[in-house]
Amino acid sequence: MNVKKSLCSAFLLTIVLGTAAPALVSANETTTQATTVVAPEATTTSEATTGLPAETTQTIDALTSTTEVSTTVDATTESEPNTEDSETAALEKAGILEAIIGKDDQYRVKNTTVHPYRSVVYLQMTFGNQTYVGSGVMIAPNLVLTAGHNIYNRETGAWASSVIAIPGRNDNSSPFGTYSSSTYYTFRQFKTEGNVIPSNYDIAVVKLNKNVSSKVGYLPLAYAVSRGQRLQIPGFPAYTDSKFGKMYTAYGTVDGVNGHLIGHLIDAESGNSGSPILNSKNEIVGIHTAGNYTIRPYGNYNWGTRINSSVLGMISHSKKTNEGSLNIATNKETKTGKTYRLYNPGARRHLFTQNLDEAQVLTTRGWKFEGLSFTTVSKGAPVYRLYGKTMKEHLYTTSKAERDALVRRGDWNAEGIAFYSGGKKPVYRLYNPGLRIHLYSSDANEVKVLKTRGWKYEGITFYTQ
């Protein structure tokens, strides 16, 4: 395997995000390994330092019971003893882990075919001509939960073009096969909030092109997590050649927690982004996303995005449709002319947009999302959108002359083509001189009533389907 380690070639993804080696890809189902480009990622040790762990290869064969469970809706506690001493002793005695040396508290998982490790997924993602690696976990026969920045680059605004998933990868072995995906979901606010680290929304679902082997199973999700709780984080660190493609796990405790984030001091490094954060029942309580960041009042920790009702909502959404919504973005959402309306109660203004990213941002700024208003054609007469700096409202027109005249006045900004006019359903424009606002309606009866209440009818402004 040809492996290239480059800090710069990773789109600076690992510098900006702190913990996730670049990786995103789709490919035909096969058990062969792909050539990968790996970039370093920030590492935080149990002392919360940013230095690299001492280079030691430690090995862990997941702790197994005599009877293996192939699916894990009811996860067992077979892999994690109650105390740190018993954890290491039991794992070493079972031949699952190699001894810990130095500051690196990650253990090599030697047997990745046992519960819960067979459900931990090596991810390889492609952005353009670059390939990156990360981790994930099976949560359904065809769904992998991972970090949002593994599949969406906030610096470039690009989705991964493809993802390869290998459950239970063990060095050059793919015991359950190799799977591909080109459909992903994340929170829309992860796209629109900028490079916030750690992010409350840095979590994603990868939908595989087919179900994985029934032997893989998947892990359940859990809400409950508290400070001091014992956790483990299995995944695929890739900072050094000696660890690349091998599964490691590490144990530690929760040091800070809020409604969206889990702060911990468990060792993680490049490639661990997307690793599941597991409790003693092997339930997923979070996804590891960022390393060595400080958030007051919690402190300087590695961070993970916590499982909550919003995450469950995104997972449910991914099972039903490839389309996006106000809060959930997907790389497969189509621009089919759907036009959404928002209302600002303070300004008493309406706005129309076909951009759900814009709509989501506006809902954080006092606008109320009113849902789908109408559907426009893909080609036709352009409908221009302008913003009045004095009137603080948006205006829509198909007239270039009106657009240009308003721009020349100096208090209107042209914002480009909003959508296209076409179809048989007219949308009327009215103006209220007292309120100094425009209103758009496709309801002829509403227009008739408004004309008797001080609204000035300005005609048909465009047509919709």
Regions inferred by a protein language model and the residue ranges of each:
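Sec-dependent N-terminal signal peptides of Gram-positive bacterial secreted proteins and lipoproteins
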Residues: 2-27
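Protease-domain processing segments flanking chymotrypsin-fold serine proteases, especially trypsin-like
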Residues: 28-29, 34-138
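Conserved catalytic-core segment of clan PA serine endopeptidases
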Residues: 90-118, 122-133, 139, 152, ...
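Cytochrome P450 catalytic-core helices
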Residues: 142, 146
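Chymotrypsin/trypsin-fold serine protease catalytic domain
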Residues: 199-268, 272, 302, 310-315
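Catalytic nucleophile loop of clan PA
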Residues: 267-289
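Extracellular glycan-binding segments that recognize GlcNAc-based cell-wall polysaccharides
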Residues: 331-465
